[in-house]
From Swiss-Prot:
This is Classical arabinogalactan protein 4. The modification Pyrrolidone carboxylic acid is found at residue 22. O-glycosylated on hydroxyprolines; noncontiguous hydroxylproline residues are glycosylated with arabinogalactan. The gene is AGP4. The modification 4-hydroxyproline is found at residues 24, 26, 28, 32-34, 37-39.
Length: 135
């Protein structure tokens, strides 16, 4: 029972240091910009007289354009006149469901490297130290 309590304590310590390491930094306070003096009123610019008007050049009237010729509306083909196409045949070899490879019976043995309690404790301790350095 004692080793389980130590493991729980280490995990809680890891979570606490991780939470402290990821806490947001305090936001910097914004300093107001220095006050600027109000703009000085400038006198309005002196109005200049408009330039003398020049007479517009005379343009000839546009020539009359002939009206476009109308064409009779075309007749749409009936559905009976449209040929129907057959769907394309599939290309390449066909694979039947029975020839699909099944799951292999021989599965690799699980690794025993991560089941060692000393490895778990060492990893937790290293993580705690890493989080403490970052905090």
């Amino acid at each position: 029972m004692g080793s389980k309590i130590v493991q729980v304590f280490l995990m809680l310590a890891l979570f606490a240091t991780s939470a402290l390491a990821q806490a947001p930094a305090p936001t910097p306070t914004a300093t107001p910009p220095p006050a600027t003096p109000p703009p000085v009123a400038t006198p309005p610019p002196v109005a200049t007289p408009p330039p003398a008007a020049t007479p517009a050049p005379a343009t000839p009237p546009p020539a009359a354009t002939p009206a476009p010729a109308t064409t009779p509306p075309s007749v749409a083909p009936s559905p009976a006149d449209v040929p129907t196409a057959s769907p394309p045949a599939p290309e390449g070899p066909t694979v039947s469901p029975s020839s699909a490879p099944g799951p292999s019976d021989a599965s690799p043995a699980p690794s025993a490297a991560f089941s060692n309690k000393a490895f778990f404790a060492g990893t937790a301790f290293a993580a705690i130290m890493y989080a403490a350095v970052l905090a």
